[in-house]
A protein has these predicted regions:
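A beta-strand edge to alpha-helix "cap/lid" segment located at domain peripheries
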Residues: 2-32, 37-132
Length: 132
């Protein structure tokens, strides 16, 4: 049986909160969540500093059922890397999928997200749904 460390549990909770905050366009929660030196690499290749990312959040497309799964958390003392698969449904019913990698640093006893890299997958219809 695998036992999660306290740090891993805390980071897993933060990861869940991060996904919920993005889905809700909750700038206030993200503001508290990100380190002052947070940077993001977005699916289009743009590189945004913290303030620019937070300014973008209200304009993100509204999606349904945003969720994360297939989470891997690796903790290295006061640094951690989180890999997560995300999925959602656009308003037109089109499913979306992607992955993100977030980097956390423990500063003054608190885990903060210092970097995010998001990749989205193009939608590929399943040729034979009976194989699922």
């Amino acid at each position: 049986m695998t036992t999660l460390t306290d740090d891993t549990k805390e980071i897993d909770e933060l990861n869940t909160e991060f996904i919920a905050a993005v889905g809700a366009h909750d700038v206030g929660r993200l503001d508290a969540f990100f380190a002052e030196d947070f940077v993001s690499t977005n699916p289009d290749g743009s590189f945004l500093a913290r303030a620019d990312y937070l300014a973008l959040v209200p304009a993100l497309p509204t999606v349904n059922n945003l969720k994360g799964d297939d989470v891997t958390i690796r903790v290295f003392d006061d640094f951690a890397i989180v890999h997560t698969h995300i999925s959602w449904v656009a308003h037109d019913g089109t499913p979306g999928h992607g992955r993100f990698t977030d980097d956390y640093a423990k500063r003054d006893g608190r885990w903060q997200c210092v970097s995010a890299h998001v990749t989205t997958y193009p939608h590929h219809p399943v040729a034979n749904p009976s194989v699922l």
